[in-house]
Protein backbone atom coordinates (compact mmCIF):
# COMPACT_ATOMS: atom_id res chain seq x y z
CA UNK A 1 0.00 0.00 0.00
CA UNK A 2 2.84 2.35 0.84
CA UNK A 3 4.38 1.63 -2.53
CA UNK A 4 1.05 2.26 -4.31
CA UNK A 5 0.58 5.49 -2.36
CA UNK A 6 4.08 6.65 -3.25
CA UNK A 7 3.43 5.85 -6.90
CA UNK A 8 0.18 7.80 -6.91
CA UNK A 9 1.81 10.76 -5.15
CA UNK A 10 4.67 10.73 -7.62
CA UNK A 11 2.22 10.58 -10.54
CA UNK A 12 0.22 13.46 -9.08
CA UNK A 13 3.31 15.62 -8.70
CA UNK A 14 4.53 14.78 -12.20
CA UNK A 15 1.13 15.69 -13.61
CA UNK A 16 1.18 18.98 -11.71
CA UNK A 17 4.69 19.72 -12.95
CA UNK A 18 3.70 18.87 -16.52
CA UNK A 19 0.63 21.10 -16.27
CA UNK A 20 2.68 24.00 -14.94
CA UNK A 21 5.17 23.49 -17.76
CA UNK A 22 2.41 23.59 -20.36
CA UNK A 23 1.04 26.75 -18.79
CA UNK A 24 4.52 28.30 -18.85
CA UNK A 25 4.90 27.39 -22.51
CA UNK A 26 1.50 28.94 -23.14
CA UNK A 27 2.67 32.13 -21.48
CA UNK A 28 5.81 32.15 -23.62
CA UNK A 29 3.69 31.52 -26.69
CA UNK A 30 1.79 34.70 -25.90
CA UNK A 31 4.89 36.84 -26.35
CA UNK A 32 4.48 40.08 -28.27
CA UNK A 33 7.17 41.89 -30.23
CA UNK A 34 7.05 45.03 -32.33
CA UNK A 35 9.52 46.91 -34.51
CA UNK A 36 9.16 50.63 -35.05
CA UNK A 37 11.11 53.63 -36.14
CA UNK A 38 11.14 57.25 -37.18
CA UNK A 39 12.82 59.18 -40.00
CA UNK A 40 13.23 62.96 -39.87
CA UNK A 41 14.50 64.57 -43.08
CA UNK A 42 14.98 68.33 -43.07
CA UNK A 43 16.04 71.42 -44.92
CA UNK A 44 17.11 74.50 -42.97
CA UNK A 45 18.32 77.92 -44.01
CA UNK A 46 19.83 80.66 -41.84
CA UNK A 47 18.05 83.91 -42.52
CA UNK A 48 21.00 86.20 -41.71
CA UNK A 49 23.65 84.78 -44.07
CA UNK A 50 21.66 82.51 -46.39
CA UNK A 51 23.68 79.39 -45.53
CA UNK A 52 21.63 76.20 -45.68
CA UNK A 53 21.77 72.42 -45.56
CA UNK A 54 19.82 69.21 -46.04
CA UNK A 55 20.16 66.62 -43.28
CA UNK A 56 18.81 63.35 -41.94
CA UNK A 57 18.21 64.49 -38.40
CA UNK A 58 17.18 61.04 -37.19
CA UNK A 59 16.83 57.55 -38.59
CA UNK A 60 15.88 55.74 -35.41
CA UNK A 61 14.83 52.10 -35.13
CA UNK A 62 13.60 50.24 -32.08
CA UNK A 63 12.29 46.85 -31.05
CA UNK A 64 10.15 46.24 -28.01
CA UNK A 65 8.26 43.29 -26.65
CA UNK A 66 7.46 40.97 -23.79
CA UNK A 67 8.23 37.33 -23.03
CA UNK A 68 5.55 37.00 -20.39
CA UNK A 69 2.94 39.38 -18.98
CA UNK A 70 5.33 41.05 -16.53
CA UNK A 71 8.66 40.97 -18.33
CA UNK A 72 9.36 43.34 -21.21
CA UNK A 73 12.35 44.77 -23.07
CA UNK A 74 13.26 47.71 -25.29
CA UNK A 75 16.24 48.34 -27.59
CA UNK A 76 16.77 51.40 -29.79
CA UNK A 77 19.49 52.84 -31.98
CA UNK A 78 19.83 55.82 -34.28
CA UNK A 79 21.35 54.79 -37.60
CA UNK A 80 21.85 58.38 -38.72
CA UNK A 81 21.86 61.24 -36.22
CA UNK A 82 23.12 63.95 -38.58
CA UNK A 83 25.42 61.34 -40.12
CA UNK A 84 26.51 59.63 -36.88
CA UNK A 85 25.53 56.21 -35.51
CA UNK A 86 24.32 56.14 -31.90
CA UNK A 87 23.34 53.18 -29.74
CA UNK A 88 20.72 54.61 -27.39
CA UNK A 89 18.67 52.27 -25.21
CA UNK A 90 18.78 48.66 -24.08
CA UNK A 91 16.88 47.62 -20.99
CA UNK A 92 14.63 45.04 -19.42
CA UNK A 93 11.62 45.90 -17.29
CA UNK A 94 9.97 43.72 -14.65
CA UNK A 95 6.46 44.45 -13.37
CA UNK A 96 6.45 43.21 -9.77
CA UNK A 97 2.75 43.88 -9.25
CA UNK A 98 0.86 46.25 -6.96
CA UNK A 99 2.21 49.24 -8.84
CA UNK A 100 5.90 48.36 -8.44
CA UNK A 101 8.21 48.03 -11.46
CA UNK A 102 11.97 47.63 -11.91
CA UNK A 103 14.07 48.54 -14.92
CA UNK A 104 17.77 47.88 -15.59
CA UNK A 105 20.08 48.62 -18.49
CA UNK A 106 20.84 51.74 -20.52
CA UNK A 107 18.16 54.42 -20.76
CA UNK A 108 17.33 58.04 -20.06
CA UNK A 109 17.72 59.18 -16.45
CA UNK A 110 14.26 59.80 -14.89
CA UNK A 111 14.40 63.58 -14.66
CA UNK A 112 12.65 66.29 -16.64
CA UNK A 113 9.73 66.21 -19.07
CA UNK A 114 10.79 67.62 -22.44
CA UNK A 115 13.91 65.39 -22.60
CA UNK A 116 11.65 62.32 -22.62
CA UNK A 117 10.02 63.20 -25.94
CA UNK A 118 11.29 61.05 -28.79
CA UNK A 119 11.94 62.31 -32.33
CA UNK A 120 8.57 61.00 -33.48
CA UNK A 121 6.78 63.12 -30.88
CA UNK A 122 8.69 66.40 -30.89
CA UNK A 123 6.46 69.45 -30.81
CA UNK A 124 9.04 71.51 -32.73
CA UNK A 125 11.71 70.67 -35.31
CA UNK A 126 14.50 71.49 -32.83
CA UNK A 127 14.39 70.42 -29.20
CA UNK A 128 14.26 72.96 -26.40
CA UNK A 129 17.47 74.04 -24.68
CA UNK A 130 16.36 71.89 -21.73
CA UNK A 131 15.86 68.81 -23.90
CA UNK A 132 19.01 69.22 -25.99
CA UNK A 133 21.67 70.85 -23.80
CA UNK A 134 20.66 71.02 -20.15
CA UNK A 135 19.33 67.53 -19.43
CA UNK A 136 20.03 65.24 -22.38
CA UNK A 137 21.38 62.35 -20.30
CA UNK A 138 21.31 58.61 -20.90
CA UNK A 139 23.21 56.31 -18.56
CA UNK A 140 23.66 52.70 -17.45
CA UNK A 141 21.89 51.85 -14.23
CA UNK A 142 18.73 50.69 -12.52
CA UNK A 143 15.48 52.37 -11.51
CA UNK A 144 12.41 51.45 -9.51
CA UNK A 145 8.98 53.02 -9.83
CA UNK A 146 5.81 52.92 -7.79
CA UNK A 147 2.35 53.92 -9.01
CA UNK A 148 -0.18 54.58 -6.27
CA UNK A 149 -3.22 52.35 -6.68
CA UNK A 150 -6.01 54.20 -4.91
CA UNK A 151 -6.75 57.84 -4.18
CA UNK A 152 -3.61 59.46 -5.61
CA UNK A 153 -2.83 58.47 -9.24
CA UNK A 154 0.82 59.46 -8.85
CA UNK A 155 3.99 57.72 -10.00
CA UNK A 156 7.35 58.04 -8.25
CA UNK A 157 10.59 56.85 -9.89
CA UNK A 158 14.04 56.57 -8.30
CA UNK A 159 17.17 55.71 -10.29
CA UNK A 160 20.87 55.04 -9.66
CA UNK A 161 23.37 55.25 -12.53
CA UNK A 162 27.04 55.18 -13.46
CA UNK A 163 28.51 58.69 -13.85
CA UNK A 164 30.36 57.92 -17.07
CA UNK A 165 28.93 58.37 -20.55
CA UNK A 166 27.23 55.51 -22.40
CA UNK A 167 30.20 55.31 -24.78
CA UNK A 168 32.62 54.65 -21.90
CA UNK A 169 31.25 51.67 -19.98
CA UNK A 170 34.69 50.38 -18.92
CA UNK A 171 35.14 53.30 -16.52
CA UNK A 172 35.17 52.46 -12.79
CA UNK A 173 34.23 55.15 -10.27
CA UNK A 174 33.60 55.77 -6.58
CA UNK A 175 30.68 58.08 -7.36
CA UNK A 176 27.18 57.48 -8.74
CA UNK A 177 24.41 59.57 -10.26
CA UNK A 178 20.96 59.68 -8.66
CA UNK A 179 17.58 60.86 -9.91
CA UNK A 180 14.07 61.15 -8.47
CA UNK A 181 10.95 61.96 -10.49
CA UNK A 182 7.32 62.32 -9.40
CA UNK A 183 4.30 62.67 -11.72
CA UNK A 184 0.75 63.56 -10.70
CA UNK A 185 -2.14 63.92 -13.20
CA UNK A 186 -4.94 66.21 -12.02
CA UNK A 187 -7.79 66.39 -14.52
CA UNK A 188 -6.47 68.03 -17.72
CA UNK A 189 -3.26 68.98 -15.88
CA UNK A 190 -0.13 66.99 -15.10
CA UNK A 191 2.34 68.16 -12.48
CA UNK A 192 5.89 66.80 -12.58
CA UNK A 193 8.81 67.43 -10.25
CA UNK A 194 12.26 65.95 -9.88
CA UNK A 195 15.70 66.04 -8.31
CA UNK A 196 18.94 64.90 -9.89
CA UNK A 197 22.56 64.83 -8.77
CA UNK A 198 25.30 63.89 -11.24
CA UNK A 199 29.08 64.02 -11.31
CA UNK A 200 30.43 63.89 -14.87
CA UNK A 201 33.88 65.01 -13.64
CA UNK A 202 35.27 66.20 -10.29
CA UNK A 203 32.41 68.66 -9.63
CA UNK A 204 29.00 67.42 -8.51
CA UNK A 205 26.02 69.04 -10.20
CA UNK A 206 22.65 69.20 -8.41
CA UNK A 207 19.47 69.89 -10.38
CA UNK A 208 15.79 70.49 -9.60
CA UNK A 209 12.92 70.38 -12.10
CA UNK A 210 9.30 71.54 -12.04
CA UNK A 211 6.79 71.24 -14.86
CA UNK A 212 3.07 71.78 -15.43
CA UNK A 213 1.38 70.37 -18.54
CA UNK A 214 -2.17 70.96 -19.77
CA UNK A 215 -4.10 69.10 -22.45
CA UNK A 216 -7.77 69.43 -23.37
CA UNK A 217 -9.39 69.10 -26.75
CA UNK A 218 -7.05 70.45 -29.39
CA UNK A 219 -5.05 72.58 -26.94
CA UNK A 220 -1.82 71.43 -25.29
CA UNK A 221 0.47 73.70 -23.26
CA UNK A 222 3.47 73.22 -21.00
CA UNK A 223 5.84 75.19 -18.79
CA UNK A 224 9.05 73.66 -17.41
CA UNK A 225 11.86 75.09 -15.28
CA UNK A 226 15.23 73.58 -14.26
CA UNK A 227 17.69 74.93 -11.70
CA UNK A 228 21.26 73.65 -11.97
CA UNK A 229 23.75 74.21 -9.12
CA UNK A 230 27.48 73.45 -9.33
CA UNK A 231 28.72 72.31 -5.91
CA UNK A 232 31.92 73.93 -4.58
CA UNK A 233 32.61 75.73 -7.86
CA UNK A 234 32.29 79.46 -8.62
CA UNK A 235 30.40 78.83 -11.86
CA UNK A 236 27.00 80.54 -11.42
CA UNK A 237 23.77 78.57 -11.15
CA UNK A 238 22.06 77.88 -14.46
CA UNK A 239 18.37 78.71 -14.85
CA UNK A 240 16.49 77.20 -17.80
CA UNK A 241 12.87 77.34 -18.81
CA UNK A 242 10.70 76.18 -21.68
CA UNK A 243 7.13 77.40 -22.34
CA UNK A 244 5.11 76.29 -25.35
CA UNK A 245 1.59 75.90 -26.69
CA UNK A 246 0.16 73.74 -29.47
CA UNK A 247 -3.33 74.02 -30.93
CA UNK A 248 -4.60 71.47 -33.43
CA UNK A 249 -7.77 71.14 -35.47
CA UNK A 250 -9.05 68.04 -37.29
CA UNK A 251 -9.18 67.96 -41.08
CA UNK A 252 -11.62 66.04 -43.26
CA UNK A 253 -11.69 64.95 -46.91
CA UNK A 254 -7.93 65.45 -47.32
CA UNK A 255 -4.84 63.27 -47.22
CA UNK A 256 -3.95 64.82 -43.85
CA UNK A 257 -6.23 64.69 -40.82
CA UNK A 258 -4.72 67.29 -38.47
CA UNK A 259 -3.47 70.87 -38.79
CA UNK A 260 -1.73 72.44 -35.80
CA UNK A 261 0.01 75.67 -34.85
CA UNK A 262 2.81 76.00 -32.30
CA UNK A 263 4.62 78.74 -30.39
CA UNK A 264 7.49 78.41 -27.93
CA UNK A 265 9.74 80.60 -25.83
CA UNK A 266 12.73 78.93 -24.16
CA UNK A 267 15.88 80.28 -22.54
CA UNK A 268 18.81 79.47 -20.30
CA UNK A 269 21.52 81.39 -18.53
CA UNK A 270 25.19 80.48 -18.98
CA UNK A 271 25.53 76.69 -18.76
CA UNK A 272 28.33 74.21 -18.07
CA UNK A 273 28.10 70.48 -18.78
CA UNK A 274 30.07 69.80 -15.58
CA UNK A 275 33.40 68.93 -17.21
CA UNK A 276 36.43 70.61 -15.60
CA UNK A 277 38.93 72.47 -17.80
CA UNK A 278 42.14 73.87 -16.29
CA UNK A 279 40.92 73.25 -12.76
CA UNK A 280 37.45 74.79 -13.06
CA UNK A 281 34.21 74.56 -14.97
CA UNK A 282 33.94 76.32 -18.30
CA UNK A 283 30.97 77.63 -20.24
CA UNK A 284 29.63 75.14 -22.79
CA UNK A 285 26.50 77.08 -23.76
CA UNK A 286 26.15 80.86 -23.51
CA UNK A 287 23.14 82.66 -22.10
CA UNK A 288 20.48 82.68 -24.82
CA UNK A 289 16.79 83.04 -25.53
CA UNK A 290 14.73 81.81 -28.46
CA UNK A 291 11.31 82.38 -29.94
CA UNK A 292 9.89 79.64 -32.19
CA UNK A 293 6.69 79.69 -34.21
CA UNK A 294 5.50 77.00 -36.57
CA UNK A 295 2.80 74.91 -38.14
CA UNK A 296 2.40 71.17 -38.72
CA UNK A 297 0.28 69.29 -41.23
CA UNK A 298 -0.14 65.71 -40.11
CA UNK A 299 -1.62 62.33 -40.92
CA UNK A 300 -2.07 60.32 -37.73
CA UNK A 301 -3.34 56.75 -37.74
CA UNK A 302 -1.54 55.01 -34.89
CA UNK A 303 1.01 53.57 -34.93
CA UNK A 304 1.72 55.40 -38.22
CA UNK A 305 2.24 59.14 -38.36
CA UNK A 306 3.43 61.44 -41.13
CA UNK A 307 4.01 65.16 -40.60
CA UNK A 308 5.13 68.13 -42.64
CA UNK A 309 6.47 70.79 -40.29
CA UNK A 310 7.78 74.32 -40.80
CA UNK A 311 9.39 76.37 -37.99
CA UNK A 312 10.92 79.81 -37.72
CA UNK A 313 13.42 80.33 -34.89
CA UNK A 314 14.61 83.71 -33.63
CA UNK A 315 17.65 83.64 -31.29
CA UNK A 316 18.69 86.29 -28.75
CA UNK A 317 22.28 86.46 -27.44
CA UNK A 318 24.38 88.99 -25.61
CA UNK A 319 25.68 91.72 -27.91
CA UNK A 320 28.86 90.71 -29.72
CA UNK A 321 28.39 86.94 -29.48
CA UNK A 322 29.04 85.09 -32.76
CA UNK A 323 26.59 82.19 -32.84
CA UNK A 324 27.72 79.00 -34.62
CA UNK A 325 25.89 77.51 -37.58
CA UNK A 326 22.60 75.97 -36.56
CA UNK A 327 22.22 78.24 -33.54
CA UNK A 328 21.22 81.33 -35.51
CA UNK A 329 17.91 82.68 -36.81
CA UNK A 330 16.63 80.10 -39.28
CA UNK A 331 13.72 78.45 -41.05
CA UNK A 332 13.40 74.68 -40.76
CA UNK A 333 11.21 72.48 -42.97
CA UNK A 334 10.93 68.85 -41.98
CA UNK A 335 9.28 65.60 -43.05
CA UNK A 336 8.67 63.18 -40.17
CA UNK A 337 7.60 59.57 -40.73
CA UNK A 338 6.82 57.46 -37.65
CA UNK A 339 5.95 53.79 -37.96
Predicted features, each with a name:
Residues 3-4, 19, 299:
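Disordered, low-complexity tails and leader-like regions
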Residues 47-50, 93-95, 106, 115-117, ...:
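Outer-membrane beta-barrel pore domains
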Residues 13-26:
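Bacterial N-terminal signal peptides
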Residues 31-165, 174-178, 182-190, 244-248, ...:
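Outer membrane beta-barrel
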Residues 1-11:
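N-terminal secretory signal peptides that target proteins for export/translocation
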Residues 9, 13-14, 291:
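Positively charged, low-complexity intrinsically disordered regions
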Residues 1, 29-30:
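Initiator methionine at the very start of the polypeptide chain
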Residues 169-175, 205, 238:
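Interfacial loop-to-helix transition and helix-capping segments at the boundaries
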Amino acid sequence: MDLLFSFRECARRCAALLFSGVMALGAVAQTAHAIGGVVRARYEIQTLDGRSRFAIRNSRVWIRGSFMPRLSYYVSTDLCDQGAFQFLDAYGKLDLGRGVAMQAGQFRIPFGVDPFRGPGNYIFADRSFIGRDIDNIRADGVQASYTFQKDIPATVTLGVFSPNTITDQNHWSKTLNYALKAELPVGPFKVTGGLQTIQPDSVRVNMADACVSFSKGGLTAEAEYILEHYVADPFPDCHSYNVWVDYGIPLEHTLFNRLSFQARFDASTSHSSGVVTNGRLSEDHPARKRLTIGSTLGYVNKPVKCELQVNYQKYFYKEGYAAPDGRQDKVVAELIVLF
